[in-house]
Every structure is written in C-alpha cells, then in structure tokens.
Regions:
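Structural signature of nuclease core domains in nucleic-acid processing machines
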Residues: 1-169
Length: 169
C-alpha cells in the first residue's frame, strides 16, 4: 500500500485558493504584511517587554521591507496588541516556544492521516498545552460563528496530535 499524503492543516484547500489574481489590486502586500507580523510575533518575545517597541521599529524600518512610516506603525501596533493582550501573556512569556513542528497520527473525516505541521507558538505547562496560530490574511472574526471552518479543523488536528503527546493535559 502507498502511504497517505501527510495532512498539512494550514495548507489552503480548493475552496480558498492560494493564487492571487494578477488583475487584483493587492500587489502581494497582504502576504508581506502577514510575513512581517509572523516574524515579529516570533522574535519580539525574546526581548524584554520594554525593548520590544524599539526592536520592532528597527526591524520594520529596514529598507528591504519598503514600508511607509504609517504602515510600519500599523503593523507594529497590531503586533504589540497581540503580544500584550492578557489572554496571550503565557504564550509569549518565559518557556513558550516559537515555530514548533508537530507531527502525529490523527483521525479525519477520510480516515487516519499523518499530521505534519508547524504552530506559531506553543506553551506546555503542568496543567495544559496551549497553541496559538495566527491568521493574518483576513480581518479577525468578531464571533466564534464567523471563524472559517477550515481553521477550526486545523486547530482540532493540532489538539488531537498534542493529546497523544501530552495525554494528561
């Protein structure tokens, strides 16, 4: 038998194409914005809280990013808003990890799959395992009902794999 293709929950499905129309107005800015925010969310927690603003400004002002001062401020404000939000404090504090690979065997609607993924942040404590995975390509939903079902399936796959690794949490 042929091995199944690894399940990669963050890979876009057919219902949400990853190719942007060359006739669109975006010029790839939403992808650039997402990459920059992800990079800041990965690296800024390594700095003391009081240093994060200056480090973020230094990173975003690099000429290679080609960002206006206003766009730099917008991206940094959004990033720092996530980092300082009380609900996320542990995920950006001591002991948390960035860009963590997760592999495992998970059950899906079409049978058993090998999961191969990378989560943005992971925190393992004595009581729980917490994961945060950022979606910067769209405005955040205001209610749980507005969350794209694909993202719910993605997080469920992560939860199922992590339950196998950390069954008591």
């Amino acid at each position: 038998p042929e091995p199944s293709r690894p399940l990669a929950p963050s890979r876009p499905s057919d219902e949400d194409p990853s190719v942007i129309s060359p006739l669109g107005d975006d010029d790839g800015h939403r992808f650039k914005r997402g990459l920059l925010i992800h990079r800041l969310l990965q690296s800024l927690p390594d700095f003391a809280t009081g240093e994060r603003l200056a480090q973020g400004k230094a990173y975003l002002s690099r000429s290679i990013h080609d960002l206006s001062p206003g766009k730099q401020e917008e991206i940094l404000a959004e990033t720092l808003g996530v980092l300082t939000h009380p609900d996320h404090a542990g995920l950006f504090g001591p002991g948390s990890l960035a860009e963590v690979p997760i592999t495992g065997i998970v059950a899906g609607k079409n049978g058993i799959h090998v999961l191969s993924a990378q989560v943005d942040r992971l925190l393992v404590t004595e009581e729980a395992v917490s994961v945060i995975d950022f979606k910067t390509n769209r405005p955040p939903p205001e209610t749980e009902a507005q969350i794209n079902p694909r993202y719910l399936r993605q997080m469920a796959a992560y939860r199922n794999a992590l339950r196998e690794i950390y069954p008591d949490r």
